[in-house]
């Protein structure tokens, strides 16, 4: 596939994912902002509206506005611009799985940055998973996009490490 087509498809995927994130967050604002809690599968999946000014598990909620601006908006934007430049430069060598992974990271990051810019530095969160008292923190699809890629990379590279160990174990020693 031609590099320009890969970049085009990457941009389409990232924009579609950002659009999906925006639509679902707006739906959560419209239907859950009044304090309504919706539960599915015996409380395994819960929808509950929250505004998070911090990061994962609300880390950084108490930061000053200026520090928050740098940590949650400016630095992530710089990272995402670097990521986009990397994809543009390396797209020729990338397969579609890597491109989709980078599109998920870009969409997840941009989804939350858009929230922070539009809604006075807070992100709309609305999903919780768990059984009984063992529950996740509250999150959104942008968080899920990035988390999916991180977990996939960890599993992929763990598998590669295991393969390398097997290959080196089968090599004759000198």
Describe each PLM feature range.
Residues 1-174:
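Alpha-helical transmembrane bundles and membrane-interface segments of multipass inner-membrane proteins
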């Amino acid at each position: 596939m031609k590099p320009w087509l890969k970049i085009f498809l990457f941009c389409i995927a990232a924009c579609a994912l950002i659009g999906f994130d925006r639509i679902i967050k707006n739906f959560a604002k419209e239907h859950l902002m009044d304090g309504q809690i919706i539960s599915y599968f015996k409380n395994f999946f819960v929808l509950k509206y929250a505004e998070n000014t911090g990061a994962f598990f609300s880390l950084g909620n108490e930061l000053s506005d200026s520090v928050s601006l740098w940590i949650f908006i400016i630095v992530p934007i710089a990272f995402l611009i670097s990521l986009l430049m990397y994809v543009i430069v390396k797209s020729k060598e990338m397969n579609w799985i890597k491109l989709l992974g980078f599109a998920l990271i870009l969409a997840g990051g941009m989804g939350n940055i858009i929230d922070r810019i539009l809604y006075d530095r807070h992100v709309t969160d609305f999903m919780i998973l768990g059984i009984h008292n063992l529950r996740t923190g509250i999150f959104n699809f942008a968080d899920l996009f990035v988390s999916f890629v991180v977990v996939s990379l960890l599993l992929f590279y763990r598998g590669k490490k295991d393969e390398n160990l097997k290959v080196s174990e089968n090599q004759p020693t000198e």
